[in-house]
Amino acid sequence: MENTIQMNLFQYFLDEEQFSIKEATDLVNNIKNMNVNNESIRARIYEGVEKGIFTKISRGVYKVTSQIEGHENTCLLVNGDGRDLSMIKDKSVDGIITDHPYDLLKSLKGGNRKFATFELFRYESRDFKEKQRVLKEGAFLVEFLPEESEVNYEYLYEIKKMAQENGLKYFAKVAWKKGTFVSNTGRKSKNMEDVMIFSNGEPRSLKLDAKKNLAVARENNIDVKGLSSYEVRDILQENNLDVYYMKGTAGMLPTVFDYQPKDSKHKIMEAEKPVELIEEIIEYISKPYETLLDQYAGSGNFVIACSNKNRNSIAIEKDNSMFEKMKNNVEKTLNVKFEEIDYEY
């Protein structure tokens, strides 16, 4: 069966320059009627790469690399479909922060999506299956979602159920208060979006265990009286001592994230999020030099926030015009220049 899958793919796509995972699964299951699950097809393709039968190359990928405190920091901008993560290896991403262009037309007439012209859709179970596949164990998924209303409450419930069914555990929800901005549409005035957080299985350990770390300091005769948990951590690390963590985000999540969005005339896109908001979320869900993903990158503020906080980033944007705006925004803000590459993975 394994060789049959590889040979069918090789023969069928022999005259083509490339094929996607989606095209491969369609060939095997619908054209060849082989009734094979997607994981097996993906595994056979990876084996084919190792054997030299296939070469995995993604075009439309732009890369910039910099040195930060002796660490290599990499950003990839991908002009592609954020729902297709086949270019990303299993369990290779330390966190996802994203805001999908949700298809709730009645709620798009006001607020920060009133000029929505991009491709809208509703999440399906397969979207969360892919998110779970690329996330490392315990890693966090952060979804920006609309404040609950009469037109979206069922969809928001579906999102939580689909995430749960694919191994993503509900962790917490924090509102983003948009400063003084208020949208007077619908049945009530609005100035919030929800930041919904899931973990891939049991949440990873990012929260400092203050009691254990103080005990380590005392055992080693280190005076840490009056110091914060973070200062104690730094001293233990300086002395090459173990630092202990508990399950959860890097700190207690706030009651609300309060950040003023830009005026519409200064935005790259209507739905863009403030860099400072993304920076705060990044610090809660990850560590420096880890790799984070935004599937629907829009303005590129996610990339800027990752760079500011010493994180590697992968940012995907499907719309060609928006992709160019994103790239220009990142290059101008960070004073960098991206180069287009053939990205082998």
Model features per residue range: what roles?
Residues 326-327:
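Conserved SAM-binding loop
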Residues 331-345:
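Class I S-adenosyl-L-methionine-dependent methyltransferase module
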Residues 2-323:
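Core catalytic lobe of class I
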